[in-house]
From Swiss-Prot:
It holds the Pfam family SelP_N. The modification Phosphoserine is found at residue 266. One of its GO terms (biological process) is selenium compound metabolic process. GO terms for cellular component: extracellular region. Keywords: Glycoprotein, Phosphoprotein, Secreted, Selenium, Selenocysteine, Signal. This is Selenoprotein P. It comes from Pongo abelii. Glycans are attached at residues 46, 83, 119, 128, 338. The keyword Repeat does not apply. GO terms for molecular function: selenium binding. Its main location: secreted.
């Protein structure tokens, strides 16, 4: 159920962050006109939800992203999200141009990969984009989301859920290009979501009960993206760069369509956040700490947000930059996942004990915390 309801906690917290280089006034507006070799990709996608990926052929991560983009396209189509256009725009640099074919071969013929010419106006600059950014537009070509790393990393569900939001929720108001078929599909998705919410088991609320007692300083059921429940005194940090969420400015002027009755204003942001926060992120780790640790709270959450992460098979390894207890026994939200959390030890190895909290210092040592372990295994310096 949590997978199907994965409008991820991260999407709930996105309004807290932004990309400094991103022009926030681009919310719910069409992008500047751009073309590549006399082709207008956005015009060709008119009437479809459009996903524009800014990938760099000379970058290994971008190549991985390209292959995962094809997987995402297939997955969305199987789930019924059929009216979606995917576009890849390669970097303008010479090294990327030389490896254009390699990038193109990583996706199917259903995803066009555009190569910018050397002397043309840089499309990335026009879109205020950076490497690995994903821009999601509605059927009328209005920008709904602009996601950057780490939130655009396709191992995690943020891009997928942002596409689904753009597909079925009128974030920028009514679009006259929405077909009856799409409207019927979105109604069925909404009804299915309501049914699954009603059938939700009680342990979900039991988990929230613990957080309500231990994290009342948060002020609501949603956690700050920077606060670890396992470290209640940890300082709050700004959102990581490379992320811009366009729900932050709902009150701005919209271009083209006057039907504003369906558009949430700034006064509805809290309701929107609460709605999204009721949905769980499959990448949230529930960390059960040893009972014999006096300083250890009952649970901590690693949201996989301020993280360096990788995915190997079905196991997700998170290397957290935040203050975390020196030992966590972690389990994923899905039973079939076997997740090991890799904490970041900030104390010398002798101090890496089960009963001590991590304290930030200039010294940093990798520390792998294993399930049911008796102590934190820290390599010697």
């Amino acid at each position: 159920m949590w997978r199907s309801l994965g409008l991820a906690l991260a999407l709930c917290l996105l309004p807290l962050g932004g990309t400094e280089s991103q022009d926030q006034s681009s919310l719910c507006k069409q992008p500047p006109a751009w073309s590549i070799r006399d082709q207008g990709p956005m015009l060709n996608s008119n009437g479809s939800v459009t996903v524009v990926a800014l990938l760099q052929a000379s970058u290994y991560l971008c190549i991985l992203q390209a292959s995962k983009l094809e997987d995402l396209r297939v997955k969305l189509k199987k789930e019924g999200y059929s009216n979606i256009s995917h576009i890849v725009v390669n970097h303008q640099g010479i090294s990327s141009r030389l490896k254009y074919t390699h990038l193109k071969n990583k996706v199917s013929e259903h995803i066009p990969v555009y190569q910018q010419e050397e002397n043309q106006t840089d499309v990335w600059t026009l879109l205020n984009g950076s490497k690995d950014d994903f821009l999601i537009y509605d059927r009328c070509g209005r920008l709904v989301y602009h996601l950057g790393l780490p939130f655009s990393f396709l191992t995690f569900p943020y891009v997928e859920e942002a596409v689904k939001i753009a597909y079925c929720e009128k974030k920028c108001g009514y679009c006259s290009l929405t077909t009856l078929k799409d409207e019927d599909f979105c109604k069925s998705v909404s009804l299915a979501t309501v049914d699954k919410t009603v059938e939700a088991p009680s342990p979900h609320y039991h988990h929230e009960h613990h957080h309500n007692h231990r994290h009342q300083h948060l002020g609501s059921s949603e956690l700050s993206e920077n606060q670890q429940p396992g470290a209640p005194d940890a300082p709050t940090h700004p959102a990581p760069p490379g992320l811009h969420h366009h729900h932050k400015h709902k009150g701005q002027h919209r271009q083209g369509h006057p039907e504003n009755r369906d558009m949430p204003g700034s006064e509805d942001i809290q309701d929107l956040q609460k709605k999204l926060c009721r949905k769980r992120c499959i990448n949230q780790l529930l960390c059960k700490l040893p009972k014999d640790s006096e300083l250890a709270p009952r649970s901590c959450c690693c949201h996989c947000r301020h993280l360096i992460f990788e995915k190997t098979g079905s196991a997700i390894t998170u290397q957290c930059k935040e203050n975390l207890p020196s030992l966590c026994s972690u389990q994923g939200l899905r039973a079939e996942e076997n997740i090991t959390e890799s904490c970041q030890u900030r104390l010398p190895p002798p101090a890496u004990q089960i009963s001590q909290q991590l304290i930030p210092t200039e010294a940093s040592t990798s520390u792998r915390u294993k399930n049911q372990a008796k102590k934190u295994e820290u390599p010697s310096n």
